[in-house]
Swiss-Prot record:
Source domain of life: Eukaryota
Name this polypeptide is given: U23-theraphotoxin-Cg1a 1
One Gene Ontology MF term: ion channel regulator activity
GO cellular component: extracellular region
Organism: Chilobrachys guangxiensis
Family, similarity comment: Belongs to the neurotoxin 10 (Hwtx-1) family. 64 (Jztx-20) subfamily.
Entry comment, domain topic: The presence of a 'disulfide through disulfide knot' structurally defines this protein as a knottin.
Entry keyword set: Disulfide bond, Ion channel impairing toxin, Knottin, Secreted, Signal, Toxin
């Protein structure tokens, strides 16, 4: 009787630990997914803000990579 109670308690403890570990892994998966989505969103927004050829600019940072701000305040080829 004592042995079966001990085995039952140990079994419940093992199940509890396994369930807790799987919940942590699931939460980590959601956190990684959300951070990846926000990272892609930030990249798209920063790319959308840069100036293409003949877009108005004040500095070279206003133009996309491969372009520079010309003396006419337009993005042009380097």
């Amino acid at each position: 009787m004592k042995t079966s109670v001990l085995v039952t308690v140990l079994g419940l403890a093992v199940i509890s630990v396994l369930c807790s570990a799987s919940q942590d892994e699931e939460q980590d998966m959601y956190d990684e997914l959300l951070s990846a989505v926000f990272e892609v969103n930030d990249e798209l927004q920063s790319e959308a803000r840069c100036g293409e050829k003949n877009d108005r600019c004040k500095t070279n940072q206003d133009c996309c990579s491969g372009f520079r701000c010309t003396k006419f305040r337009r993005c042009g080829r380097r």
